Amino acid sequence: MKTRKVLDAYALLAYLKGEGGHRRVKEMLASADSDLLINAVNACEVFYTLARARGIREAEYFLNVILPGLPVTVIDNTFEEVIEAARLKAAHALSFADCFAAATAIRERAPLVTGDREFEKLGRAVDVDWLE
């Protein structure tokens, strides 16, 4: 049985940039053991981070070539799901994008893959699979 995991933008950026935790993310992407998900907001977070750091062309390449080629399902948001993220934002000092990642993990009952220590603020509300 496959396990579901939700990727935070941190995980995909680590993979793309070869930063800390990138090997684990690469293994997850290559493994048939996990269904990998990312919220659309967090995929956009990867896009704008790449655009700022490396330019719009590289960000567009990620969006149009790399992301569609990865075994990752992009999860869109209904209004109710946006409100779930807003409730987390109201209760915790996290970025709104991080709240979407957390809300997706909670809704999907799946661990959130990240190395972003900001998620420690959520305590046990989210099961985090920490990247080293």
Protein language model regions, located:
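Short, well-structured N-terminal submotif of metal-dependent ribonuclease cores
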Residues: M1-I38, A51-V65, L131
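Acidic, PIN/NYN-like endoribonuclease modules and their adjacent C-terminal/linker elements
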Residues: K2-R4, A102-E132
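Acidic active-site catalytic centers that drive phospho-/nucleotidyl reactions
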Residues: D8, E45, D98, D116
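A generic structural signal for short hydrophobic patches within well-formed alpha-helices
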Residues: L12-L13, A43, F119-E120
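Short beta->alpha linker loops
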Residues: G20, V41-N42, N77-E80, F100, ...
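Conserved beta-strand segments of alpha/beta enzyme cores
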Residues: D35, P71-T73, D127-D129
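Active-site neighborhoods of divalent-metal-dependent phosphate/nucleic-acid chemistry enzymes
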Residues: V72-V113
